[in-house]
């Protein structure tokens, strides 16, 4: 006969083991404000209030929508939102890093990133060499000012390059400077790579994650471009979001950032946030 105490102990062990095998999303979570670009163009204060009402406290900057950096910072403060990262134009990083640093100071972000490397029809090894020079130089100056530099993947970097890809070449070319990476799981998938495996391959280089799903049936390419309608609510598309979250937790991703490129962010952003609140992994 099994004693009551032994049975209860076994039951507790069973549940504790199950709990150890699964977990809920803990974040920290932010919203890339580019998701709300059309709304922000019409009404910055009202849109930021909606973002706060969705339950967000943190955001990633994606432009100023007709305001100065100082004015936009004031609107964030009024809405009760904090910018944790921002994107800067490649040419500004190359030609006017002091301006970028000045704007980063206004928003008091930790990360300053670049989301697009100018290039011709195809991304080339020469583009990697040039961008690595710009990124390395910018990263050193940003670090001296108290910030971290990161590059946001956009899909075109996965063109084959020997036994690897041009992304591998970019990682290697920026290994001596403090250059970090932001894995956009939509664009990584669209470019033919596996976002979870990429995190596992470079666990020391990824610090931010763009959570974005891709419409089922979408065929990717290496252009870094896709129709906005191929961006769908998180958890409803073809990206293995759960697998990405498992890999991200293992390597210690600092920020999980929802981004929507769809024409329905007021529907898809809350739906994606709700998905994260319910998922177990």
Q: Could you tell me what each predicted segment is?
A:
Residues 57-58, 65, 90-181, 266:
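Active-site acidic/histidine proton-transfer and metal-coordination neighborhood
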Residues 265-281:
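C-terminal helical cap(s) of enzyme catalytic domains, especially alpha/beta-barrels
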Residues 31, 51, 59, 76, ...:
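Conserved, mostly hydrophobic/aromatic
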Residues 27-32, 59-61, 83-88, 112-114, ...:
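Hydrophobic faces of well-ordered beta-strands that scaffold small-molecule active sites
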Residues 2, 19-111, 204, 278-281:
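N-terminal pre-domain/capping segments
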Residues 6-16:
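Bacterial N-terminal signal peptides
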Residues 144-238:
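Acidic/histidine-rich catalytic cores of soluble enzymes
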Residues 34-36, 62-64, 88-91, 117-119, ...:
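Active-site beta-loop-alpha junctions enriched in small/polar residues
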